[in-house]
């Protein structure tokens, strides 16, 4: 019996050593040696064949073998578990990595940057200002006094009697001219707010305001700058026209239309069969605005223009619903 026990222990030692750090295989080996129907249990069953006088000694040998086997497998399982976990945590730096998905700029951000790039190229500097604006800068300094009918044209978010969420980026015209002397050539991109929400309007939208002031600035300069912008943004083959309009802070004023990008000027549902689409408003700075900032309208002239970035983006990419920009739908955003 002692020889059988010795062989059993030697076999267990060798097989555990051969399996090294394979915890699952060691667990299976433990069942084979220590399980209810295992090798050691078979030897215990043979105790009945051992002479009664020898049974105490044989029983002691078998119990010692059981303790030794339990210790052997416990140590092997602990070692195998630790080293197996270590292997799982190791990183093979020679294996090619998985490239994470790249983010993209929102289409409005892309177009806003493109607009700024074009005007930077034309020599315009970017200026910024507060979105929560004083009524004075948003209206009065732009030739829109409290009793002016033009105030009815804009649905305004009022923070208090004299503070509003700016309805346009035009206040940057006044703020810039208050701080600087001509010549001035700036654009002011930013968010604006109005109480309006439908397929073509949202309560928050983006605008870019432009201002150029100096000696002998003419409407011809305005037309030249905006013609270059349109051709850079939409292509050199896109026609444009200047249509008389009204804005309280410019005189004369004009809307700028481009040939419909959908039908190439032939007439379609998007352009209401006219072949033209409005993209921005513009005009020569009203002398009264110059006086509000301390400029002499007899010495300087200038022009201003303003455009909605959402409008430009919709025309550039053929988008027919403004609300798509704010729904965070990956199916839409991944196209840009």
Swiss-Prot record:
How and how many cofactors are bound, per the record note? Binds 2 magnesium ions per tetramer.
Q: GO CC annotation: what is one? A: cytoplasm
> What InterPro entries does UniProt report for this protein, alphabetically?
aa-tRNA-synth_II (IPR006195), aa-tRNA-synth_II/BPL/LPL (IPR045864), Phe-tRNA-synth_IIc_asu (IPR004529), Phe-tRNA_ligase_II_N (IPR004188), Phe_tRNA_ligase_alpha1_bac (IPR022911), Phenylalanyl-tRNA_Synthase (IPR002319), tRNA-bd_arm (IPR010978)
Q: Which UniProt keywords apply?
A: Aminoacyl-tRNA synthetase, ATP-binding, Cytoplasm, Ligase, Magnesium, Metal-binding, Nucleotide-binding, Protein biosynthesis
Q: Which residues form the signal peptide?
A: none
Question: Record's Pfam families?
Answer: Phe_tRNA-synt_N (PF02912), tRNA-synt_2d (PF01409)
Q: Name one GO biological process term.
A: phenylalanyl-tRNA aminoacylation
Q: Report the subcellular localization.
A: Cytoplasm
Q: Which GO terms describe its molecular function?
A: ATP binding; magnesium ion binding; phenylalanine-tRNA ligase activity; tRNA binding
For this protein, the Enzyme Commission number is 6.1.1.20
Q: Which reaction does it catalyse?
A: tRNA(Phe) + L-phenylalanine + ATP = L-phenylalanyl-tRNA(Phe) + AMP + diphosphate + H(+)
- SUPFAM superfamilies, per the entry: Class II aaRS and biotin synthetases, tRNA-binding arm
The protein's required cofactor(s) are namely: Mg(2+)
Q: NCBIfam families annotated for this entry?
A: pheS
Family listed:
Belongs to the class-II aminoacyl-tRNA synthetase family. Phe-tRNA synthetase alpha subunit type 1 subfamily.
Q: Which PANTHER family match?
A: PHENYLALANINE--TRNA LIGASE, MITOCHONDRIAL, PHENYLALANYL-TRNA SYNTHETASE
Name the UniProt record assigns to this protein: Phenylalanine--tRNA ligase alpha subunit
Organism expressing this protein natively? Syntrophobacter fumaroxidans (strain DSM 10017 / MPOB)
Q: What is this protein's gene name?
A: pheS
């Amino acid at each position: 019996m002692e020889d059988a026990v010795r062989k059993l222990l030697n076999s267990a030692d060798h097989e555990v050593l051969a399996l090294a750090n394979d915890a699952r295989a060691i667990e299976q080996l433990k069942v084979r040696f220590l399980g209810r129907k295992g090798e050691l249990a078979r030897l215990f069953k043979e105790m009945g064949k051992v002479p009664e006088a020898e049974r105490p000694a044989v029983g002691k040998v078998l119990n010692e073998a059981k303790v030794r086997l339990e210790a052997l497998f416990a140590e092997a399982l602990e070692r195998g578990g630790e080293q197996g976990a270590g292997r799982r945590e190791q990183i093979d730096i020679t294996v090619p990595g998985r490239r994470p998905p790249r983010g993209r700029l929102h289409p409005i951000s892309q177009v806003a940057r493109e607009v700024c790039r074009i005007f930077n190229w034309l020599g315009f500097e970017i200026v910024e200002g507060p979105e929560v604006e004083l009524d004075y800068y948003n209206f009065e300094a732009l030739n829109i006094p409290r009793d002016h009918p033009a105030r009815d044209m804009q649905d305004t978010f009022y923070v208090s009697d004299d503070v509003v969420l700016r309805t346009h980026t035009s206040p940057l015209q006044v703020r810039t001219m208050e701080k600087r002397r001509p010549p001035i050539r700036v654009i002011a991109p930013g968010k604006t707010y109005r109480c309006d929400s439908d397929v073509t309007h949202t309560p928050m939208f983006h605008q870019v305001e432009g201002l150029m002031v100096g000696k002998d600035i003419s409407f011809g300069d305005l037309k030249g700058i905006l013609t270059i912008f349109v051709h850079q943004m939409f292509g050199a083959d896109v026609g444009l026209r200047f249509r008389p309009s009204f804005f309280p802070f410019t005189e004369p004023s004009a809307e700028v239309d481009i040939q419909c990008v959908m039908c190439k000027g032939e007439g379609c549902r998007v352009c209401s069969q006219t072949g033209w689409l409005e993209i921005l408003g513009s005009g020569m700075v009203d002398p009264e605005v110059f006086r509000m900032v301390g400029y002499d309208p007899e010495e300087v002239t200038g022009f201003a223009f303003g455009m909605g970035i959402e409008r430009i983006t919709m025309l550039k990419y053929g988008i027919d619903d403004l609300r798509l920009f704010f729904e965070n739908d990956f199916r839409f955003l991944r196209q840009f």
